[in-house]
């Protein structure tokens, strides 16, 4: 389950602003980690950028008329700030750990190959944000144990996702840290429960 916006409820101007943050994240991942990193791009971290930007109001840089290789016929607007770089690093950490976990579960060779391609980028992001990297690593290990033991306490299992996301949402150790951790925790629990619900629908249909 990705955290995305309901575009039907947004004005055209707000759609463009949201897209500019998404494009800004994409290009930041390219500049910080290379083209291969762009394949790991997701909307979850765009949501985090919008959330933290609205809260902290950092100075942003806007670039109009940008044309990317994915959409060569459309001119885009890029919007970036210091939070964009943080979100790019979180995107890399999450992608790498998920790829490794999927490889262990499914023995998917393409995922293993992509994880190996991201290894250098992962090490760079991990060095910059060791606390967040440890939170994701611990989360996957604890979730794996719960799955192996067939833990049926969905609230407790969903709480693992919440704890991890809470750490990622708490960008700084400041007056917003507690609120952001709590928000991320509830968001993470909701995401896990919705994923479980979608899986139930898939297997029962």
Regions found by a protein language model. Name each.
Residues 2-23:
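Low-complexity, Ser/Thr/Pro/Gly-enriched N-terminal "stalk/linker" regions
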Residues 198:
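Short active-site segment of divalent metal-dependent hydrolases/proteases
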Residues 203-204:
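Conserved small/polar residues in nucleotide/adenosyl-binding loops
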